[in-house]
Amino acid sequence: MARLPWFPVAVAGDSMEPTLRSGEWWLARRSDRVTVGDVVVVSQPEQVGLLTVKRITRRDGTRWWVEGDNPDRSRDSRHYGPVDQEAILGRLVVRYRPLPLRRIPRRGG
């Protein structure tokens, strides 16, 4: 099964404040093309399975340096160094508000 090019991201925590706030929802686009300044979803190198949202601040050879916009509240490349390209899963593109959950009514019931 093919992967969709977009995936939802729920922001949790304050490491990206004031740019992103906890509770916001964003769509991220899977892409190998990222650049300095992009806000990306990163597979956290210190904790397998943990995804974080950080800003790319510089390129370090073939790897990327990622940091939170709120340095006092962010665990990022300042702690664990640059991340591999494969650790960057996508780039945040657009903020959205999820619709409230509703049941689909049955017909003729």
Indicate residue ranges for each PLM-predicted region:
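Extended hydrophobic leader/signal-anchor segments used for secretion and membrane insertion
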Residues: 1-109
